[in-house]
Amino acid sequence: MNIRIALAVFVFLALIPAHAQQSKPALVAEGGQPDDRGSARVLYWNTVKNEAAGQFAINYGRPVWKSIYEDPAKFDGMTKGKTWRMGSNFWTILDSCLPLKISGRDVSAGYYYLGLHRSEDGRKWSLAFIDPAKVRAAHIDAYDINKAPVAFEVPMSIATPAAKAEKLTIELTYPKDDIRKVTLSVKWGTLALTAPIEVTVAE
């Protein structure tokens, strides 16, 4: 009798994980509500023809900076030797109809997903360009950006933040007397990075 009871208990316990696994849905959905997203755009306007001469924009989610990131060990563990999504939720996107030169590298007009890569020693940061077609083909979410093949990178310079950015802030600034020379700025908490952009645009 004891053997039968023990066998019954064993079978019952063995079935519990299988039942739990069967009750878990194989597919779930997230999102659907408006996200907190930002957009930095530079538009060139031909005043003679009264029409656009070209433009480029970076669209991105705005994650909130957390005080825990100010712990150097924690921040290094998150970023050293890794590519960060540089945003939240959907991919950060560069959409340009103009040829650009970013940190000295030619970037053809087109559509790119962006990330930030930090070197293994933590001394260098670079802007990572990812082919959206390859991401779509592999169904990769920005959360898993380190699974996405990086097409190329351009260096970014570390800057001193004027103030702590509570949310990720990406800006494109330019002097009024030289509008083809644009500075890309990425600010998040105590992190501040910049890269020069030269824009090719006809009058």
Q: Could you say what each language-model-derived stretch is?
A:
Residues 16-20:
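Sec/Tat signal peptide C-region and signal peptidase I cleavage site
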Residues 6-15:
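Bacterial N-terminal signal peptides
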Residues 83-140:
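Mid-length scaffold segments of soluble, non-membrane domains
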Residues 7, 66, 90, 100-102, ...:
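A generic structural micro-environment signature
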Residues 21-82, 119, 132-203:
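Primarily secretory-pathway and cell-envelope proteins
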Residues 1-5:
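Positively charged n-region of N-terminal signal peptides that target proteins for export
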